[in-house]
């Protein structure tokens, strides 16, 4: 493709028609991939800045790569801010300040629709059908809190199906973490009282809760019910301990404390969560593409990206002012459909102390991050030298597969870069039988037939039965990956590492030649006895070589290989479990998803359905006697 003008000349040509209004502009590279998204109060003035002479290196690189420029006019600065945030989230442009690995925070959910409510962990933006507490900074914080709550209040954590199928108490009852409502060890009224206590505790009403429990303990003691009184006493002690360990604030009730710090051009933003006056954990973030950016810019971009995924508290307390605070507040309110929000920078008092504490933690987190970053940089440079790469690798893709005697085969790709693993870029490839792949290619769509088969009941017969052919697995995975890379050239890896030996080397070369691509690759195989530390490396045109197992670069390569290996095993097991769940019920004519769910809900498990009589089967809604007989006969026939 021949482009008439690019870079600063392109921007100059666009300035002629650029309006003096608020809006958002987008810069694209030669492949129409978004390089940068920016907002402007005045589009013409903002674009004029890009043709000045005093630009920093990052901006100069961006302009040099710009081949296309588009802009959209908005009705206000707030709309421009909103559109910019949405486009950054969608396209993740390489020259924008980006917030990586920002998962939604987990909650504790109390399911109230059941007679005996369940306490469980929940992650998601939509909070409905229950009572929610949190968010918490990590799964560890949620799991720790849930464990403590189960020890103190002994509410059930099992699913409804498991609950309905119990005939005797489970292990949770034996270790005193559940009152076993499934088998009637506690009545509804007493259980509901425990649910109320849990809600009081999680909503921060601990003082009232402890006073109520103390009164109840005295009543039980006066009635000579000493065992029950002792249990209440232990609950009060446990609550005091948990409260002390978690940390309670009288300064803030519902707030996020956010501190930003900078060192050597790198930034860390530390977030502390407080809900109902209780500390719910903290987590550090390290925004990328922050070269030549100010604290104000980084913090503004952080807030807009962070609160697209997270629930907004009543107050956001930060350690540094941002330039466009009022518009940022309005944008966050619109994103989350809320009416009230305060963003403040305290100078003194209890809130200032909380911010100071967040700053101390942020500095510590940044120092640890920079040590890890520097070590990674050294190792990545060694990888460049080791495999004769033309430049320091920005993106390394590692491939592995997993199967059992060729069954349920999956291939995986994990991705690593300068700052570690990029889990958003991980991919899973379900590997299909060669005959199916050939047939689907002949039909003109190499994936449609396989996907339809995978969704259907023939999953065991069409997916993953590859007869243990590692080369065919790799051939399929790389064919699909390189096909995708043709559509996404900006994601071309600097290096591919394949878990395999000399034979795999030939397969990779074959697929590369077919696609006329020349991506550097290496195959990494275990030694003669398959022991870690004796890995062999296979590169086209070189003799097989090994590395000293104590070298940092060798340990790093092992970490990459192990990450791919573990990811492959995890997804193989998921696929196998999915296939195993397809039972004989799927072979019965007249039993679709609705009736299958009705059977499993009524009896609680597949085994219980198998053990049921014809009379019991006919009791299920939607199952008549004739169908019950058919189900019974199919479930009891010999293989």
Swiss-Prot record:
InterPro entries found in the cross-reference section: GIY-YIG_endonuc, GIY-YIG_endonuc_sf, GIY-YIG_UvrC_Cho, RuvA_2-like, UVR_dom, UVR_dom_sf, UvrABC_protein_C, UvrC
Domain annotation UVR: ranges: 207-242
Origin: domain of life: Bacteria
Keywords: Cytoplasm, DNA damage, DNA excision, DNA repair, Excision nuclease, SOS response
Residue ranges annotated for the GIY-YIG domain, each copy included: 20-97
Listed GO biological process terms: nucleotide-excision repair; SOS response
UniProt family annotation: Belongs to the UvrC family.
Protein name: UvrABC system protein C
Species of origin: Rickettsia rickettsii (strain Sheila Smith)
Gene that produces this protein: uvrC
């Amino acid at each position: 493709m021949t482009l008439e003008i690019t870079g600063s000349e392109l921007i100059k040509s666009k300035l002629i028609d650029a309006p003096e209004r608020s809006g958002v502009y987008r810069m694209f590279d030669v492949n129409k991939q978004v390089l940068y998204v920016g907002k402007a109060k005045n589009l013409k003035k903002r674009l004029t800045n890009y043709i000045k002479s005093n630009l920093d290196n990052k901006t100069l690189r961006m302009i040099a790569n710009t081949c296309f420029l588009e802009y959209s006019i908005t009705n206000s600065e707030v709309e421009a801010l909103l559109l910019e945030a949405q486009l950054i989230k969608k396209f993740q442009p390489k020259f924008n300040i980006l917030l990586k690995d920002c998962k939604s925070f987990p909650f504790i959910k109390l399911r109230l629709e059941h007679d005996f409510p369940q306490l469980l962990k929940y992650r998601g933006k939509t909070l409905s059908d229950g009572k929610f507490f949190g968010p918490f900074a990590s799964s560890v914080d949620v799991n720790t809190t849930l464990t403590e709550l189960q020890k103190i209040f002994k509410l059930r954590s099992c699913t409804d199906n498991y609950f309905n199928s119990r005939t005797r108490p489970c292990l949770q009852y034996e270790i005193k973490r559940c009152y076993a409502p499934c088998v009637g060890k506690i009545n509804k009224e007493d259980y509901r009282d425990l649910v109320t206590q849990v809600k009081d505790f999680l909503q921060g009403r601990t003082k009232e809760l402890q006073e109520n429990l103390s009164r109840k303990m005295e009543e039980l003691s006066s009635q000579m019910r000493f065992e029950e009184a002792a249990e209440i006493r232990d609950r009060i002690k446990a609550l005091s301990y948990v409260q002390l360990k978690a940390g309670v604030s009288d300064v803030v009730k519902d707030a996020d404390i956010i501190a930003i710090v900078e060192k050597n051009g790198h930034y860390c933003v530390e977030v502390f969560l407080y809900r109902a006056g209780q500390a719910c954990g903290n987590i550090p973030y390290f925004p990328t593409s922050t070269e030549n950016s100010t604290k104000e810019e980084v913090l503004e971009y952080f807030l807009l990206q962070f609160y697209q995924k997270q629930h907004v508290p009543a107050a956001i307390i930060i350690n540094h002012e941002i330039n466009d605070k009022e518009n940022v507040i309005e944008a966050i309110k619109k994103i989350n459909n809320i009416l009230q929000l305060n963003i403040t920078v305290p100078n003194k008092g209890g809130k200032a102390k909380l911010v100071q504490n967040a700053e101390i933690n942020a500095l510590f987190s940044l120092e640890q991050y920079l040590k890890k970053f520097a070590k990674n940089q050294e190792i990545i440079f060694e990888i460049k030298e080791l495999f004769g790469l033309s430049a320091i690798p920005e993106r390394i893709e590692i491939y592995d597969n997993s199967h059992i005697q060729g069954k349920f085969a999956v291939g995986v790709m994990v991705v690593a870069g300068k700052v570690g693993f990029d889990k958003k870029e991980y991919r899973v490839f379900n590997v299909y039988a060669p005959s199916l792949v050939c047939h689907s290619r002949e039909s003109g769509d190499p994936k449609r037939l396989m996907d339809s088969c995978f969704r259907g009941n023939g999953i065991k017969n069409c997916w993953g039965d590859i007869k243990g052919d590692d080369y065919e697995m790799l051939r399929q995975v790389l064919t699909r990956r390189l096909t995708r890379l043709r559509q996404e050239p900006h994601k071309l890896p600097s290096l591919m590492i394949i878990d395999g030996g000399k034979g795999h080397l030939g397969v990779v070369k074959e697929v590369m030649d077919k696609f006329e691509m020349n991506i550097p690759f290496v195959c990494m195989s275990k030694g003669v006895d398959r022991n870690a530390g004796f890995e062999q490396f296979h590169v086209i045109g070189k003799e097989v070589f090994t590395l000293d197992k104590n070298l940092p670069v060798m340990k790093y390569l092992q970490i990459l290989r192990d990450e791919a290996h573990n990811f492959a095993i995890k997804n193989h097991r998921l696929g196998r479990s999915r296939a195993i769940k397809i039972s004989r019920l799927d072979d019965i004519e007249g039993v679709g998803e609705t009736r299958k769910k009705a059977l499993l809900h009524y009896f609680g498990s597949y085994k219980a359905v198998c053990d049921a009589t014809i009379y019991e089967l006919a009791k299920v809604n939607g199952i008549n006697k004739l169908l019950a007989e058919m189900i019974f006969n199919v479930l009891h026939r010999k293989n």
